[in-house]
């Protein structure tokens, strides 16, 4: 998008007065028609300066895309504070901005007002007015618009079918007919035989001009990205959920390019449609990616809070998915791509994104689907867009079988039933391997009967950073229960972890240590209806004694252990036995550390502790839960100062230590992994 000119405008005084003080009746008529473009005059200030200068004296914050080529300066999303979000406040704030800018003589164009998704508005104005806008009392933050891109450059149907259920043809448990899927993409050729009668092309269109031309090409001349994805989701022959209906929103131009603001307006269109005519379960497919966007992530959070399932492409940049939106939004199910050998998708020098913001992977290479070249044509395409379309189709089938599933329940089921440990992790950067889930999506063996299964997943925090007071924080989804907390540092310099309540929710905190390079907090998040959980803490016991913490309340069981300390190095500590005979399960900690027992009561819940230790230090020690049991807690017994941390991988507890060849460890510094395994007695 181009910006409105910011040069000084010298207009004759009579004409200026006529524009600003023209007949009120005429202006009211223009407003009623909805075609009146809000143009206000202003006075030039200075040339664009550094973004940091915008914060001087302002109460709001300014955000822009970290990737300069994707920025669209001159167009801004202004987001208001929720506490001030009266329905008329966005218009009032926009007009106040225009009135104040009028004294400075610029042109400001009001492009859109948000009501149904988040309180705010979209404006086109000079960057010189940003500081003025940031000072407005109701403004929370302002984000510069930026570009988003399509992420696309029948083995796939076989791959998503569990091996023991594979037949000569793809036979899904249902067609997903009770679910409506919204697709934000390019235009779609709805007359293609693969999707004819299954796609409704809405009248929504918000696309930027194509690069190098001022004219939009006809829909039939587009690159068929939207048509292909519609076929992957619900095509008659090559589709995943063959009975799902689709609604198409046109937010990407024929070059596969859109904007954050267009995606926002599209999401608000969906929310408004949901309010006007509530229907059954909704899935929104977001096969696009742009730079990290606070406002786009916030919009996804709002829509997910309204019960909508959002599935997004991780991105095709062979990079950390947390650097992109909407892939980085925690409320979005983010999907990476694999090939026919279950290996990460490679696209020349690029490939699938990865990291802690990815939930799982799905087929994304050489996917056969509908082509807009003709009504019977097919084409092969690759990318994380195709992978996300597979998961959207699987989600549609799961929601058709169980329409009351929440987002948290759906995500946990997708993770639980995925094929595990099939991806070659060596493809990922070394620092991302432990963070990236080794999961490839498959259909559940049955879309019913999982009601009593205990589902858990591992959630990694962002890296804390290297400062002394830096603290990493991992949190679960609102419908999940935090059952345990652990930490991990590649340097080994950390100060443990603990669970705290913040804003009415429990979070997992892990502080960095002096001289450390940063730390991760690792939360174990589970679905545990009717749970009553608490943390019991035992202070440091003193020299020569281990610290013990256990559950005090009757009926509560131990689900996790953690500990934290203030000193730089705890030193070595030879631990006693985990559970003295005749005593309940308990957490053991170093004598110099505070030890925390995470305890929960839930109907039918039972848990047990498993320990596996080695007499000499090893780089990795693991202990796994038996079939039918779910890992809820993972920790290391206090036996060595060389432990890097502990984390859960599916139902296996992993404890990592520094390379023994460089540590000078002794045989007394044993390493032990402690797993807490739980299940519902309804399944026993």
From Swiss-Prot:
Excised during maturation, the propeptide residues are 29-151
Q: Where in the cell is it found?
A: Cytoplasm; Secreted; Endosome; Lysosome
Region ranges (C-terminal domain)? 451-684
Q: Which UniProt keywords apply?
A: Apoptosis, Autocatalytic cleavage, Calcium, Cholesterol metabolism, Cytoplasm, Disulfide bond, Endoplasmic reticulum, Endosome, Glycoprotein, Golgi apparatus, Hydrolase, Lipid metabolism, Lysosome, Phosphoprotein, Protease, Secreted, Serine protease, Signal, Steroid metabolism, Sterol metabolism, Sulfation, Zymogen
Q: What CDD domains does the record point to?
A: PCSK9_C-CRD, Peptidases_S8_PCSK9_ProteinaseK_like
Query: Cellular component per GO?
Result: cell surface; cytoplasm; early endosome; endoplasmic reticulum; extracellular space; Golgi apparatus; late endosome; lysosome
Q: Which residues are glycosylated?
A: 532
- Disulfide-bond pairs as recorded: 222-254, 322-357, 456-526, 476-525, 485-508, 533-600, 551-599, 561-587, 607-678, 625-677, 634-653
Judged by the first EC level, this protein's enzyme class is hydrolase
Cofactor(s) recorded for this entry are: Ca(2+)
Annotated site (Cleavage), which positions?
A: 151-152, 217-218
Q: How is it modified after translation?
A: Cleavage by furin and PCSK5 generates a truncated inactive protein that is unable to induce LDLR degradation.
Q: Where is the Inhibitor I9 domain?
A: 75-148
User: So what does this one do?
Assistant: Crucial player in the regulation of plasma cholesterol homeostasis. Binds to low-density lipid receptor family members: low density lipoprotein receptor (LDLR), very low density lipoprotein receptor (VLDLR), apolipoprotein E receptor (LRP1/APOER) and apolipoprotein receptor 2 (LRP8/APOER2), and promotes their degradation in intracellular acidic compartments. Acts via a non-proteolytic mechanism to enhance the degradation of the hepatic LDLR through a clathrin LDLRAP1/ARH-mediated pathway.
Q: Subunit info? A: Monomer. Can self-associate to form dimers and higher multimers which may have increased LDLR degrading activity. The precursor protein but not the mature protein may form multimers. Interacts with APOB, VLDLR, LRP8/APOER2 and BACE1. The full-length immature form (pro-PCSK9) interacts with SCNN1A, SCNN1B and SCNN1G. The pro-PCSK9 form (via C-terminal domain) interacts with LDLR. Interacts (via the C-terminal domain) with ANXA2 (via repeat Annexin 1); the interaction inhibits the degradation of LDLR.
The UniProt entry's sequence similarity note says: Belongs to the peptidase S8 family.
This chain's protein is named Proprotein convertase subtilisin/kexin type 9
């Amino acid at each position: 998008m181009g910006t409105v000119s910011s040069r000084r405008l010298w207009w004759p005084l009579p004409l200026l007065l006529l524009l600003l003080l023209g007949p009120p009746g005429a202006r009211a008529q223009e407003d009623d028609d909805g075609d009146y473009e809000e143009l206000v005059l202003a006075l030039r200030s200075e040339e664009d300066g550094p973004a940091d200068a915008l914060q001087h004296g302002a109460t709001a914050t300014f955000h822009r895309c970290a990737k300069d080529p994707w920025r669209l300066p001159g167009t801004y999303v202004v987001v208001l504070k929720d506490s001030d979000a009266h329905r008329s406040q966005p218009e009032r704030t926009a007009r106040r901005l225009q009135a104040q800018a009028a004294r400075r003589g610029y042109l400001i164009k009001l492009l859109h007002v948000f009501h149904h998704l988040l309180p705010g508005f979209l404006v086109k104005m000079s960057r010189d007015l940003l500081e003025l806008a940031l000072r407005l009392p109701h403004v929370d933050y302002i984000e510069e618009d930026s570009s988003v891109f399509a992420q696309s450059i029948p083995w796939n149907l076989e791959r998503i079918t569990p091996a023991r259920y594979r037949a000569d043809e793809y036979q899904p448990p249902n067609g997903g007919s009770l679910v409506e899927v919204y697709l934000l993409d390019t235009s779609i050729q709805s007359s293609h035989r693969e999707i004819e009668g299954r796609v409704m092309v809405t009248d929504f269109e918000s696309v930027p001009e194509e690069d190098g031309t001022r004219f939009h090409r006809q829909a039939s001349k587009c690159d068929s990205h939207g048509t292909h994805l519609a076929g992957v989701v619900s095509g008659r022959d090559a589709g995943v959920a063959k009975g799902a209906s689709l609604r198409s929103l046109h937010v990407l131009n024929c070059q596969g390019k859109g904007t954050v603001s267009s995606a926002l307006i599209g999401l608000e269109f969906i929310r408004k449609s949901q309010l006007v005519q509530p229907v059954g379960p909704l899935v929104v497919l977001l096969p696009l990616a742009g730079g990290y966007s606070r406002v786009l992530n916030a919009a996804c959070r709002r829509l997910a809070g309204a019960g909508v399932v959002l599935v997004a492409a991780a991105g095709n940049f062979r990079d950390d998915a947390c650097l992109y939106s909407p892939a980085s939004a925690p409320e979005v199910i983010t999907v990476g791509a694999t090939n026919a050998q279950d290996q990460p998708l490679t696209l020349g020098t690029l490939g699938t994104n990865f990291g802690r913001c990815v939930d799982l992977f799905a087929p994304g290479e050489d996917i056969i689907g509908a082509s807009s070249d003709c009504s019977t044509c097919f084409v092969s395409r690759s990318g994380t867009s195709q992978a996300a379309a597979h998961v959207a189709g699987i989600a549609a089938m799961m929601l058709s079988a169980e329409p009351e599933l929440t987002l948290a329940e759906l995500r946990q089921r997708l993770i639980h039933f995925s094929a595990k440990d099939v991806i070659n992790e060596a493809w990922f950067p070394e620092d991302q391997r432990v963070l990236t889930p080794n999961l490839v999506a498959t259909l559940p063996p049955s879309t019913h009967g999982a009601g009593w299964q205990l589902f858990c997943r591992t959630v990694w925090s962002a890296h804390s950073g290297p400062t002394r007071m830096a603290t990493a924080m991992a949190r679960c989804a609102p419908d999940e229960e935090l059952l345990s907390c652990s930490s991990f540092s590649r340097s080994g310099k950390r100060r443990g972890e603990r669970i705290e309540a913040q804003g009415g929710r429990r979070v997992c905190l892990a502080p960095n240590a002096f001289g450390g390079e940063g730390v991760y907090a690792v939360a174990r998040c589970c679905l545990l209806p009717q749970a009553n959980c608490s943390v019991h803490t035992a202070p440091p016991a003193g020299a020569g004694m281990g610290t013990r913490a256990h559950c005090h309340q009757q009926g509560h069981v131990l689900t996790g252990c953690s500990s934290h300390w203030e000193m730089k190095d705890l030193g070595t500590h030879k631990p006693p036995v985990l559970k003295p005979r005749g005593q309940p399960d308990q957490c053991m900690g170093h004598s110099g550390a505070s030890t925390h027992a995470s305890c929960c009561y839930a109907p039918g819940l039972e848990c047990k502790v498993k320990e596996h230790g080695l007499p000499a230090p090893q780089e990795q020690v693991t202990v796994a839960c038996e079939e039918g049991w779910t890992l809820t807690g993972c920790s290391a017994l206090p036996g060595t100062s060389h432990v890097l941390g502990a984390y859960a991988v599916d139902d296996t507890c992993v404890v990592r230590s520094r390379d023994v060849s460089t540590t000078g460890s002794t045989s007394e510094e044993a390493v032990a992994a402690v797993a807490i395994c739980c299940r519902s007695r309804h399944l026993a």
